[in-house]
């Protein structure tokens, strides 16, 4: 393990332990592994899609991507509303990162964290932001529904069972439903097919209510 990896895995990811259940250490570990996997898959996709080389054949520093993925949600320490912007501030203020990165690289890491949020209206400013944003959007129906419910339980404790189910369904439709605000950025990601499957469930009123109810009862 390199000194950077030691810092990331022993000091950065541990900060997620105090966040809500949907954004704890398992979440950041998944985002890190997914971001690096997407990077590793890029060359073979470019080989199969030579017409995309002009847009996508970009140099990517693996360590910069690792740091961006690891730090993307650190701003949750101040709450969710502006966590992407707060993550950028925390990254820029981290003196330890200067041991491995220059000022430009740290700014790239900070911008990737700022740009990862699904509700953002603009595309990420760099391929690092796109990779982190895509990795943060791991499309697994059960995981998404569980995280949605868990977020509601933490932030809306006054709701009863039916209230939590209704809130979860409304959020799923707004974010993941057809025409929802979630955007995917990496064309070689598996997320598009998985999102289509989830959208089929969300579009079926009975199916989505049953799915949310079953997962709610399991928590």
Protein language model regions, located:
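Intrinsically disordered, low-complexity activation-like regions
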Residues: 10-11, 15, 114, 141
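Divalent metal-dependent phosphate-bond-processing catalytic cores, especially two-metal-ion Mg2+/Mn2+ enzymes
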Residues: 17-25, 29-59, 71, 118-219
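An active-site-proximal "capping" alpha-helix that borders the catalytic cofactor pocket
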Residues: 31-38, 82-97
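Acidic/histidine metal-binding catalytic segments
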Residues: 44-48, 57-64, 99-113, 128
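His-Asp-centered metal-binding catalytic motifs of divalent-metal-dependent phosphohydrolases/nucleases
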Residues: 58-79, 83, 87, 108-117
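Short helix-to-loop capping/linker segments positioned immediately adjacent to catalytic or ligand/cofactor-binding
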Residues: 78, 97-101, 119-123
């Amino acid at each position: 393990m390199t000194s950077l990896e030691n810092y990331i895995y022993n000091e950065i990811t541990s900060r997620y332990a105090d966040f809500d259940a949907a954004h704890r250490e398992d979440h950041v570990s998944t985002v890190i592994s997914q971001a690096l996997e997407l990077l590793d898959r890029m060359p073979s996709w470019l080989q199969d899609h030579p017409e995309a080389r002009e847009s996508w054949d970009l140099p990517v520093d693996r360590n910069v991507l690792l740091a961006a993925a690891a730090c993307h949600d650190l701003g949750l320490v101040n709450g969710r509303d502006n966590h992407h912007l707060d993550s950028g501030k925390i990254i820029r203020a981290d003196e330890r990162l200067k041991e491995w990165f220059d000022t430009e690289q740290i700014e790239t890491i900070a911008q990737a964290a700022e740009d990862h949020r699904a509700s953002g209206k603009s595309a990420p400013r760099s391929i690092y932001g796109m990779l982190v944003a895509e990795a943060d959007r791991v499309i697994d129906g059960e995981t998404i529904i569980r995280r949605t419910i868990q977020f509601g339980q933490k932030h809306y404790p006054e709701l009863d069972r039916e209230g939590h189910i209704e809130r979860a369904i409304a959020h799923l439709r707004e974010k993941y439903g057809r025409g929802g605000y979630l955007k995917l950025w990496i064309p070689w990601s598996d997320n598009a097919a998985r999102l289509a499957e989830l959208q089929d469930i969300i579009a079926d009123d009975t199916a989505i209510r049953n799915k949310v109810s079953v997962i709610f009862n399991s928590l």
